[in-house]
Amino acid sequence: MADKKEGGVHRFYKIEDGKTVKLRHICSRCGKGFFMAQHKDRRSCGKCGLTEFNQ
């Protein structure tokens, strides 16, 4: 059998003091459940294509 991949949404969250903390930004157009990809100089949404540049 193939090796199991560690994927899924759980890698976008971290648990601190019994509470979950989001590690990525959420797309302002798509809403909850759609995380933005982190790049060196920007954040981008893979669904709608929204790009936010870092200051």
From Swiss-Prot:
* Amino-acid positions noted as binding Zn(2+) in the UniProt annotation, renumbered to this chain: C27, C30, C45, C48
How is this protein named in the record?
Small ribosomal subunit protein eS31
Traced from the root, the source organism's taxonomic lineage reads: Archaea, Nitrososphaerota, Candidatus Cenarchaeales, Candidatus Cenarchaeaceae, Candidatus Cenarchaeum
What Gene3D superfamilies does its record include?
Answer: 6.20.50.180
Q: How is the cofactor bound?
A: Binds 1 zinc ion per subunit.
User: Which GO terms of the cellular component aspect does the record hold?
Assistant: ribonucleoprotein complex; ribosome
Write down the required cofactor(s). Answer: Zn(2+)
What InterPro entries does its record include?
Ribosomal_eS31, Ribosomal_eS31_arc, Ribosomal_zn-bd
- Please cite one Gene Ontology biological process associated with this protein: translation
What is the similarity comment for this entry?
A: Belongs to the eukaryotic ribosomal protein eS31 family.
Q: Which Pfam families match?
A: Ribosomal_S27
Oligomeric state and partners? Part of the 30S ribosomal subunit.
Which segments does the record annotate as C4-type zinc fingers?
Answer: 27-48
UniProt entry tagged with the keyword Zinc-finger: yes
Q: Give the keywords, sorted.
A: Metal-binding, Ribonucleoprotein, Ribosomal protein, Zinc, Zinc-finger
Molecular function (GO) terms for this protein are: structural constituent of ribosome; zinc ion binding
Gene name of the encoded protein: rps27ae
Q: Which organism is it from?
A: Cenarchaeum symbiosum (strain A)
